[in-house]
Amino acid sequence: MQIIQTKQQYICYNPELLTETPEMAFSSEFWQQQNKIIGSAQGRGTTWFVQGEKLAMALRHYRRGGLFGKLVADSYLFSGWDKTRSVAEFSLLNHLIAHQVNVPKPVAARAVRLGWFRYQADILVEKIANSRDLVGILGQETLSQQVWFDVGAMIKRMHDAGVCHTDLNCHNIILDDHKTVWIIDFDKCYRLEGANWQEKNLARLHRSFIKEQGKRGILFNEDNWQWLCKVIRVNGNKGQ
């Protein structure tokens, strides 16, 4: 990892993955001028998918949600560079990769101070090729028992790494075209000791499946859930 730091800006990046000028790489206009924008997705803002020299990436600007987000859309209280949303997510992704959890590779993170007390943030991460989230897949087809085992195993691996995914839901678990399981979107996630929190984390995921089953009619049932939890239970967590 390399760092570029001034009084107003902090950038950390992986030079093996980002060969473009780091200061320019967080601008969608830069990628547009290079004709390197390959897609986009809408959430709290626009996530731009761009083609770098080394890999395809997702460029995301951090934005708040909810009512408070309407008042303060994209700035946060500054309490140190390492505690900014982007740098924290960059570090957490590297931690997960070191523990063999399938997550997007962090490419670069930036935080820019706004005066003394606030900052804005952006992150570039690997774009997982030919992937869909579980909601999209289950809206069209069922998954095999083995895939549900694999989903449970990847969640267990994340928990064993001591990481609580605070927004663990069926939109944030994706499969690529080889049916490899990936977990995404680690903004505001953090490390925790012990295992007491893991059951609540699984319960959150279970609620998301039930919600999407009622909302979109996804092809999910309780047998699927038991298959997912089986690997976790064998390894010492009782799950839902």
From Swiss-Prot:
Q: Which GO terms describe its biological process?
A: lipopolysaccharide core region biosynthetic process
Keyword annotations for this protein?
Answer: ATP-binding, Cell inner membrane, Cell membrane, Kinase, Lipopolysaccharide biosynthesis, Membrane, Nucleotide-binding, Transferase
Which residues carry out catalysis? Answer: D167
Q: Name one Pfam family in it.
A: Kdo
Q: EC no.?
A: 2.7.1.166
Which domain of life does the UniProt lineage start with?
Answer: Bacteria
What protein name is recorded for this chain? Answer: 3-deoxy-D-manno-octulosonic acid kinase
Which organism does this sequence originate in? Photobacterium damsela subsp. piscicida
Origin organism lineage = Bacteria, Pseudomonadati, Pseudomonadota, Gammaproteobacteria, Vibrionales
